[in-house]
Amino acid sequence: MFKRQTTGSVVCASCGYLVGVNDATCYNCGRRNPGLWGFAPALRSLGKDLGFVPFVTGTCIALYALGLLASGGQVMRGGLFSFLSPSALALFLFGASGQTPVFDYGRWWTVLSASWLHAGLLHILFNVLWIRNLGPVVGELYGAGRMVIIYTVAGVTGFAMSSLAGETMGWLPIRALQGAQITVGASAPIFGLLGALVYYGRSTG
């Protein structure tokens, strides 16, 4: 039950120390409003990620299924890595990013939406597994709020750079450096989570 606690002690949302539910700051880590207006216990019941990881994976799966439905009979085409793949048109309409959507059609918002879309069964399977493994760990180490910021900023940055490379670096002889005409997937946010873990490990020894 999502219930507000008005008296007693709660666990600080940042450091895990016991604090008064109405304390202005945590005596251990200095966080302001450590009791989160009395909702800290209810929020902690959602997990270290405050339910963000299940939300991301569930939304990705739902959008993938909708993409398949919108693609009609085109989903069975191609080999193993394109098996059950939504059509390029469906991905474009749902918010795929890349040089074509961003620069040719002015769909700048796709740098935010593309990380929620996937281009095939194996694509979404591997990404969902990575998110489910990395997300809770990053949430525990950094806090749910910072984890959401890391995930979102990494996704936006990755797709923005890929789209920009597709617009300006097509002349390069190495295909991997030429960016993408159209692209989807949670790889950029996943690398953001992984980078956060690497940074935490290096900074704490």
Q: Which stretches of residues belong to each language-model region?
A:
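A broadly conserved sequence feature marking short terminus-proximal activation segments
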Residues: 1-5
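A detector for small-residue-rich transmembrane helices and their helix-helix packing motifs
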Residues: 7-23, 27-205
